[in-house]
Curated annotation (Swiss-Prot):
Temperature-dependent activity: Optimum temperature is 45 degrees Celsius.
A matching Pfam family: CN_hydrolase
Protein name: Nitrilase blr3397
pH-dependent activity: Optimum pH is 7.0-8-0.
Species of origin: Bradyrhizobium diazoefficiens (strain JCM 10833 / BCRC 13528 / IAM 13628 / NBRC 14792 / USDA 110)
Keywords for the protein's UniProt record, in alphabetical order: Hydrolase
Lineage start: Bacteria, Pseudomonadati, Pseudomonadota, Alphaproteobacteria, Hyphomicrobiales
GO molecular function, a single term: nitrile hydratase activity
The keyword ATP-binding belongs to this UniProt entry's keyword annotation: no
Subunit structure: Homodecamer.
PANTHER family registered for this protein in UniProt: CN HYDROLASE DOMAIN-CONTAINING PROTEIN, NITRILASE
Xref: InterPro entries: C-N_Hydrolase, C-N_Hydrolase_sf, Nitrilase/CN_hydratase_CS, Nitrilases_CHs
Length: 321
């Protein structure tokens, strides 16, 4: 059902900035200030990069050549685990407060800690309701698999809001056709793509997804220099503090693949674009990947969205005489 309070057009923002990989609280405080800045410019939706809170450890091998785990790698993981966040912690409270104060719906990447396992997670904040959900990255890429766990099918939400149907797919998950199809089947119209991919090939990927899903795509990547990390941080890209580890490339794309803002590679910035939700419907006139262009008589996708737990406890109740 169409939301009668839905704005015809509103302003969205994509934040391209460096987080503090040594302090999640500092990163959260920076994010809160950027939410306030974007909202002050009129943005009702604000999207942040992958792993903005907790940090993306670009260039770190975690001391793990094949068949070996070095002591210094174990210590690097301990420090990374310390920088991750619990979802009932002060970092989440800080973002929730900024979203509440501004009314801006916010999507932000974090490193989520659950006991001994870390997850690359996207968090969703509604200004009125606080943290409303999360998406855990299903498939970490290459070396990420050493430090991050795998999300299951229970955290692939699309939220119906007055700003459109909002969801998130993280970095190279965007190359998983079946995941994209699942998002399209949920009617996603605001497709958020937090990422660490700053290559020239990323923008065409985002344009393809916008065209394929007939949705707005908002992709956010950090602009991060080596100097954000301590001098003794192990980095395959060297020790020069001015070396750019991630160069951004954030962008906003409309449902017909037109780039509305970005890409920007020059430094930290906030990109803005007007989101006209009627363009989603206009786009689906001739292509609806999960609807009239889907051919379910030939192809079908089965999605298991049940949570998968390593241990399930069944407790016996002793009968009373």
């Amino acid at each position: 059902m169409m939301d009668s309070n839905r704005p015809n057009t509103y302003k969205a923002a994509v934040v391209q900035a460096a987080s503090d990989p040594t302090s999640s609280l500092v990163s959260a405080q920076k994010a809160a200030a950027l939410i306030e800045k974007a909202a002050g410019a009129g943005a009702r939706l604000v999207v942040f990069p992958e792993a903005f809170i907790g940090g993306y450890p670009k260039g770190n091998s975690f001391g793990a050549p094949v068949g070996m785990r070095k002591p210094e790698g174990r210590e690097a993981f301990r420090l990374y685990w310390e920088a991750a966040i619990d979802l009932d912690g002060v970092e989440v409270e800080t973002i929730a407060a900024a979203a509440a104060a501004t009314g801006a719906f916010t999507v932000i990447g974090c490193i989520e800690r659950e006991q001994g396992t870390l997850y690359c997670t996207a968090l969703f904040f509604d200004g009125a309701r606080g943290l409303v959900g999360k998406h855990r990255k299903l498939m970490p890429t290459a070396g990420e698999r050493l430090i991050w766990g795998f999300g299951d099918g229970s955290t692939m939400p699309v939220f119906e809001t007055s700003l459109g149907n909002i969801g998130a797919v993280i970095c190279w998950e965007n190359y998983m056709p079946m995941l994209r199809m699942h998002m399209y089947s949920q009617g996603i119209s605001i497709y958020c793509a937090p990422t660490a991919d700053d290559r020239d090939t990323w923008l065409p990927t985002m344009q393809h997804i916008a065209l394929e899903g007939r949705c707005f795509v908002l992709t956010a990547c950090q602009h991060l220099k080596r100097g954000a990390f301590p001098a003794d941080y192990e980095c395959a890209l060297g020790a020069d503090p001015e070396t750019v580890l991630m160069r951004g490339g954030s962008a906003i794309v409309n449902p017909l693949g037109k780039v509305l803002a970005g890409p920007c590679f020059e430094g930290e910035t906030i990109l803005y674009a007007d989101i006209a939700l009627d363009e989603v419907t206009r786009g689906k006139f001739d292509f609806d990947a999960a609807g009239h262009y889907s051919r379910p008589d030939v192809f079908q996708l089965v999605v298991d969205d049940r949570p998968k737990r390593a241990v399930s406890t069944v407790s016996a109740v002793r009968a009373r005489n």
